[in-house]
């Protein structure tokens, strides 16, 4: 499986490839593609040529990169699903040109997802386009958390559950939830017009456009316009920008060059958008409605303390670990406020 890790684990300093290899392409405008073959070559030969060229130029995951691109051009998801006979056949001139064109994009450090313009998220195949944030495996785990809770606590049969996603990107979270829960209806907020358009396109391709309403709104800048738009929401879910600003300079070029920086940078402590979500959430959620956040492993303790000090209507329920054992997900719940009502002195 091609490793699409969260931005936190894709810092250049943590890559296993030598730093001088990683950054070689950054010292010049472009890396040159290998010479176009004079004669015909097979898919296996093309795989070998591009794997070696990616290695020589410090492209991360060189073998997987060439395999996914060439499998895509052969109409398959993975190279393992392509028949060996097909791999041993000569490529047509047009196919070879396509291999060189797409692999040259990867050579520029464009993520494979953007090169082939699609990617699988759980059981969905979604269109991908820069600069819209690419969903990571950790976010699939976030969806599983939400699904488990909604399936175990479906709520009233008379009132279908509703979900609000803040920062929907490609639509991966909302669309995955809608596909798994036929009774669910979803709303999404997204500041980027590129992401709004891509979410709507993915919803239409999956036949889910009638159950997902995407608003082109910034949760911080457009906060005053939001009251009344949403109420009695069962679940609020978000994979918000949560990187510490100081970490932005050390991101891999796949991220820093091609993905929307605003979808990554969470401010000095990574909590700018998260604090805003938690401030607004009580106005949107039904009583005992829940919030599910994907966060930096340094965040859960900070979020717990901040909520206790600033948002009386929310209770921090628990922190969940991701598959790597890192504290990655925060679950909170709206509770009835116990604050005494103000007494009119007149």
For each of these PLM feature ranges, what is it?
Residues 1-38:
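N-terminal mitochondrial targeting presequence
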Residues 2, 70-149:
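Conserved AdoMet
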Residues 16, 37-50, 61, 111:
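Short, structural beta-strand-to-alpha-helix junction motif
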Residues 69, 109, 139, 173, ...:
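Residue-level signal for inorganic ion chemistry
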Residues 141-250:
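Conserved SAM/SAH cofactor-binding pocket of Class I
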Residues 241-273:
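Mobile active-site "lid"/loop adjacent to the S-adenosyl-L-methionine
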Residues 268-334:
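Conserved Class I SAM-dependent methyltransferase catalytic core
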Residues 336-346:
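Flexible, glycine-/basic-rich loop-and-beta segments that form/coincide
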């Amino acid at each position: 499986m091609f490793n699409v890790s969260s931005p936190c684990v894709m810092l250049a300093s943590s890559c296993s490839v030598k730093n001088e290899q990683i950054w070689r392409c950054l010292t010049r405008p472009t890396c040159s593609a290998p010479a176009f073959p004079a004669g015909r070559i097979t898919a296996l030969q093309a795989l070998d040529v591009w794997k070696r060229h990616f290695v020589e130029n410090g492209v991360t995951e060189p073998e997987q990169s060439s395999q996914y691109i060439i499998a895509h051009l052969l109409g398959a998801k993975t190279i393992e699903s392509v028949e060996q006979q097909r791999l041993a056949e000569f490529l047509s001139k047009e196919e070879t040109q396509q291999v060189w064109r797409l692999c040259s994009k990867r050579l520029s450090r464009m993520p494979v997802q953007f090169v082939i313009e699609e990617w699988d998220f759980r059981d969905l195949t979604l269109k991908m386009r820069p600069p819209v944030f690419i969903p990571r495996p950790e976010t699939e785990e976030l969806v599983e958390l939400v699904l488990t809770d909604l399936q175990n606590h479906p709520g009233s049969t008379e009132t279908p559950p509703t979900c609000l996603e803040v920062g929907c990107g490609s639509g991966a979270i909302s669309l995955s939830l809608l596909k798994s829960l036929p009774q669910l209806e979803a709303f999404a907020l997204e500041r980027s017009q590129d992401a709004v358009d891509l979410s709507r396109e993915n919803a239409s391709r999956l036949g889910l456009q009638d159950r997902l309403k995407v608003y082109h709104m910034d949760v911080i800048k457009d906060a005053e316009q939001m009251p009344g738009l949403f109420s009695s929401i069962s679940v609020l879910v978000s994979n918000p920008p949560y990187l510490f600003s100081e970490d932005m300079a050390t991101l891999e070029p796949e991220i820093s060059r091609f993905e929307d920086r605003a979808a990554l940078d969470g401010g000095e402590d990574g909590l700018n958008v998260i604090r805003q979500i938690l401030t607004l959430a009580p106005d949107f959620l039904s009583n005992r409605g829940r919030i599910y956040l994907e966060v930096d492993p340094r965040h859960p303790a900070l979020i717990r303390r901040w909520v206790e000090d600033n948002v009386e209507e929310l209770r921090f329920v628990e922190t969940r670990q991701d598959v790597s054992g890192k504290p990655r997900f925060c679950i909170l719940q709206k509770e009835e406020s116990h604050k005494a009502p103000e007494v009119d002195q007149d």
